[in-house]
């Protein structure tokens, strides 16, 4: 193969790879916006005023054993204990740190009524690590969510 032809193939291959990477980034492959789930619920991560938040959109068990809608019974504010868990905005304030990480947010745990500092980090296009912590991130818990089918960023 002639050396100039080899260089042309290398340049064409490089440009094709660069174009595919650019298209992948532009289509939201690195965006957490959309639907996510864990073993208990489905969540929607959304953008509001340039920051990310999340709300509960479905529960595996939406009612109590008595058949009543689950409410925020552990909230430290008694006036909020009757609000439904379904639709609850429980994460807020996340700012983008990198293409895969959002920080400086908070996460509210309706099972305990506690609010924690939090960050999110994408682990590929279909997994996100959500870490809630007190003080420093070494003291906390990480939950892994998977992107819900059809929940891609559009």
Language model features: what each stretch is:
Residues 134-154:
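Edge beta-strand at a domain terminus
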Residues 47-49, 56-58, 109, 122-124, ...:
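A mature extracytoplasmic/lumenal domain signature
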Residues 32-33, 38-117:
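Central antiparallel beta-sheet cores of small beta-barrel/beta-sandwich binding domains
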Residues 98, 124-126:
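Residue-level recognition of beta-strand termini and adjacent short loop/turns
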Residues 23-35:
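N-terminal helix-cap/turn-to-beta initiation motif at the start of protein domains
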Residues 41-42, 133-135:
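Short beta-turn/strand-loop junction motif enriched in small, turn-promoting residues
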Residues 1-5:
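N-terminal secretory signal peptides that target proteins for export/translocation
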Residues 10-22:
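Bacterial N-terminal signal peptides
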């Amino acid at each position: 193969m002639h050396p100039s032809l080899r260089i042309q193939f290398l340049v064409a291959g490089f440009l094709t790879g660069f174009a595919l990477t650019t298209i992948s980034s532009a289509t939201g492959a690195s965006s957490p916006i959309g639907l996510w789930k864990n073993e208990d619920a489905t969540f929607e991560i959304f953008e509001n005023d340039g920051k990310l938040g999340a709300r509960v959109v479905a529960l595996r068990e939406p009612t109590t054993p008595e058949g009543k809608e689950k409410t925020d019974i552990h909230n430290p504010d008694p006036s909020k204990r009757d609000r439904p868990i379904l639709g609850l905005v429980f994460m807020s304030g996340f700012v983008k740190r990198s293409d895969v990480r959002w920080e400086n947010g908070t996460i509210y745990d309706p099972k305990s009524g506690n609010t924690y500092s939090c960050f999110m980090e994408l682990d590929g296009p279909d997994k996100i690590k959500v870490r809630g912590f007190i003080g420093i991130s070494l003291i906390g818990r990480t939950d892994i969510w998977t992107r819900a089918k059809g929940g891609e960023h559009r």
